[in-house]
């Protein structure tokens, strides 16, 4: 889903700026119970073990967590040794499990959160907003609430304050489709880890992505009609489906030969396209979402 690509984009953009990046996806289900004693430290310790084995990592670390991978992210933040090396933590439509006593607010990290649709932002940390450390700004976007503008960056990254950015649009399938979320997320990255690199605007990237996506969608819709056409007229299918075809005398020999040739050509021309639509969509997302070019378009 597109929220996964947004994690890759974050990782590539941070890596482009010289950071060591850990991309946490799904924790191993069944490896350990989740939230035992109100913590997630035991969910995926293998991430921490691997991180500690990399002795050359002494700082400039970014950790991301996608969906349930947010549990892995939490395990990173709760590790007393490694959390001090983390400069930025990114949770994308993530699950949590931290408690006030286990959040390492004293460490050098900042957080950008895109909360899941319909989930109380406070539930990620399991305690009331009033009980949150003053360094953490908990934000909830409520329909009809215009107390702040969509896309506004809250908190001060220079002081390493943590930020929770909650939007009703940040759902799993569509987290990284909308242009305003593109811009906002890269705004977070830019302020979390500033770079001296000059980024040239390229406004054609996003419209091109949409155009190609709509073309693929149209081709996918056409698949049903073409399949029905094949069942109705292709000789190989019509006999098994008991479809009545025009007799040879009803149409000319040339027209019949052309129709049979067309019936045979259609599957060879179109079906490989349909069969690879999913992989093509992945390729499109990789090209238009998982490169720094999309960042140059919206930073």
Predicted regions and their residues:
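Cytosolic-side membrane-insertion boundary helix
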Residues: 195-224, 228, 234-258
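Conserved small/polar residues in nucleotide/adenosyl-binding loops
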Residues: 294-299
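Soluble extramembrane regions of membrane proteins in the secretory/endomembrane system
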Residues: 1-204
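Membrane-helix interface motif
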Residues: 231-237, 272-288
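Alpha-helical transmembrane segments
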Residues: 259-272
């Amino acid at each position: 889903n597109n929220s996964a690509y947004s994690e890759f984009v974050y990782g590539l953009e941070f890596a482009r700026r010289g950071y060591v990046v850990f991309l946490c996806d799904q924790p191993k289900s069944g490896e350990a119970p989740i939230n035992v004693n109100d913590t997630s430290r035991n969910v995926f310790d293998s991430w921490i073990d691997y991180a500690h084995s990399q002795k050359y990592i002494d700082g400039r670390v970014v950790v991301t967590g996608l969906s349930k991978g947010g549990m892995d992210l939490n395990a990173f933040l709760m590790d007393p040794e490694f959390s001090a090396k983390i400069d930025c933590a990114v949770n994308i439509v993530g699950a949590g499990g931290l408690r006030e006593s286990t959040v390492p607010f004293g460490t050098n990290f900042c957080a950008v959160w895109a909360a899941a649709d319909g989930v109380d932002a406070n539930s990620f940390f399991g305690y009331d907003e009033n009980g949150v450390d003053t360094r953490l700004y908990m934000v909830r976007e409520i329909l009809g609430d215009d107390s702040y503008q969509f896309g506004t960056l809250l908190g001060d990254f220079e002081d390493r304050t943590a930020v929770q950015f909650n939007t009703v649009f940040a759902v799993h399938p569509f987290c990284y489709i909308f242009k305003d979320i593109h811009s906002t997320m890269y705004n977070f990255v830019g302020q979390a880890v500033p770079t001296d690199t000059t980024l040239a605007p390229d406004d054609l990237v996003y419209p091109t992505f949409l155009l190609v996506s709509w073309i693929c969608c149209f081709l996918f819709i056409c698949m049903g009609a073409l399949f029905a056409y094949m069942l109705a007229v292709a000789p190989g299918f019509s006999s098994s489906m008991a479809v009545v075809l025009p007799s040879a005398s009803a149409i000319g020999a040339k027209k019949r030969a052309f129709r049979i040739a067309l019936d045979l050509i259609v599957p060879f021309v179109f079906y490989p396209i349909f069969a690879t639509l999913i992989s093509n969509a992945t390729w499109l997302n990789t090209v238009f979402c998982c490169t720094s070019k999309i960042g140059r378009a919206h930073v």
